[in-house]
């Protein structure tokens, strides 16, 4: 994907690079039959993750810089977007002085981090952990960032220790949206289509999935506060879901491949531009096409509260619940669940190129 994107091709055109690269590899460079899973995940995952990497790297790079500033920016950009760095090296852009692109920065950009303690209920192997949650929001659909793919996107990740380091990665970008109201209205609505990547790894769910979604984003003025909601329908071309604790002798895997769909609802409350409360619920149904199970039902609930303390600092707590119900031909397994709570210190930074911008951004799953 980046081979195309970093050389001037559009989002959709670069997606053909990812598809053709995967197809050539699957059909001509392996001694096994082409894998549908590899085609889907390489193409769609390459598009989602590639576009986010491309836009973040463009923000980091400065084509007018020189000296140590230029070196460190080029190095950071290469870490975020290695293929884009190879393209810049081949063109001589790493050392050339020329104007930055007009769309180097989005209209707004925000970064948030939660550092604290996590307790996992039930029979978790490591119930008590340090945890770090990171999220970034690029663009604002209520400021018109809805016309090109990923003009607005959101990313989030959870890192924990001791134990498995990564327990969550979520990436979500609006492909195209339409404003249904005027900018001056007290209640505003944006409808749109998005592309997503989801990865969860906990006691109840080990899931990786590419997804498309359609929904309505709404923003409400409530006195000095503001609220935002997101109601979404999900379509999942293919998900990988761990359904057994052992390798299936027929597939050699402990996870199954399954397409599916679902719904998600979220709400957030803001004081100024700072989120102070959030809650979300989602449910997904999948039908196994390759694996030991017959179907799966995955659910989640998350709730968070943050209290600003001073400046960029705040404190907060959260509760999460995850569930997986898997059915199998020939035997029964009970529903698996995990609940957890967190206490943390929050640090939030934001910047906007729009005068007077302080409105809440897109609600997104945390």
Predicted regions and their residues:
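Residues that define the transmembrane beta-barrel architecture of outer-membrane proteins
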Residues: 107, 126-134, 167-174, 206-212, ...
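Residues on the lipid-exposed face of transmembrane beta-strands in outer-membrane beta-barrel proteins
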Residues: 3, 48-52, 132-140, 171-182, ...
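Repeated loop/turn-to-beta-strand initiation elements of outer-membrane beta-barrel proteins
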Residues: 12, 56, 142-146, 184-189, ...
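Transmembrane beta-strands of outer-membrane beta-barrel pores
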Residues: 115-121, 159-163, 195-201, 233-239, ...
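Detector for outer-membrane/organellar transmembrane beta-barrel domains
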Residues: 110, 205-288
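Transmembrane beta-strands of outer-membrane beta-barrel proteins
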Residues: 17, 107-113, 148-157, 187-193, ...
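Outer-membrane beta-barrel "beta-signal"
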Residues: 337-366
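Extracellular loop and loop/strand-boundary signature of outer-membrane beta-barrel proteins
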Residues: 121, 199-203, 247-254, 287-292, ...
């Amino acid at each position: 994907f980046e081979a195309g994107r970093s050389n001037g091709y559009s989002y959709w055109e670069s997606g053909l690079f990812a598809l053709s690269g995967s197809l050539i590899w699957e059909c001509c460079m392996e001694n096994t039959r082409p894998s549908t899973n590899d085609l889907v995940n390489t193409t769609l995952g390459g598009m989602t993750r590639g576009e986010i990497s491309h836009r973040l790297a463009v923000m980091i790079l400065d084509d007018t810089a020189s000296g140590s500033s230029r070196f460190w920016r080029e190095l950071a950009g290469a870490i975020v977007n290695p293929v884009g760095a190879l393209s810049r090296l081949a063109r001589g852009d790493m050392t050339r002085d020329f104007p930055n692109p007009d769309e180097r920065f989005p209209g707004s950009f925000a970064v948030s981090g939660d550092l604290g303690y996590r307790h996992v209920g039930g029979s978790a192997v490591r119930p008590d952990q340090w945890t770090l949650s990171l999220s970034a929001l690029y663009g604002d659909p209520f400021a018109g960032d809805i016309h090109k793919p990923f003009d607005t996107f959101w990313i989030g990740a959870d890192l924990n220790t001791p134990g498995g380091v990564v327990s969550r990665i979520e990436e979500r970008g609006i492909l195209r949206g339409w404003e249904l109201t005027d900018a001056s209205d007290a209640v505003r609505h944006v409808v749109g289509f998005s592309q997503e990547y989801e990865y969860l790894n906990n006691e109840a769910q080990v899931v990786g999935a590419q997804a498309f979604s359609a929904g309505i984003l709404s923003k409400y003025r409530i006195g000095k506060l503001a609220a935002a909601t997101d109601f979404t329908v999900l379509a999942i071309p293919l998900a990988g879901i761990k359904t057994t604790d052992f390798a299936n002798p027929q597939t050699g895997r402990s996870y199954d491949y399954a397409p599916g769909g679902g719904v998600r609802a979220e709400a957030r409350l803001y004081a100024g531009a700072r989120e102070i409360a959030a809650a979300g619920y989602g449910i997904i149904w999948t039908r196994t096409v390759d694996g030991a199970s017959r179907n799966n039902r995955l659910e989640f609930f998350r709730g968070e509260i943050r209290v600003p303390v001073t400046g960029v600092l705040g404190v907060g707590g959260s509760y999460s619940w995850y569930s997986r119900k898997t059915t199998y031909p020939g035997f029964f397994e009970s529903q698996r669940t995990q609940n957890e709570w967190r206490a943390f210190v929050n640090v939030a930074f934001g910047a906007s190129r729009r005068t007077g911008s302080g409105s809440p951004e897109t609600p997104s799953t945390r």
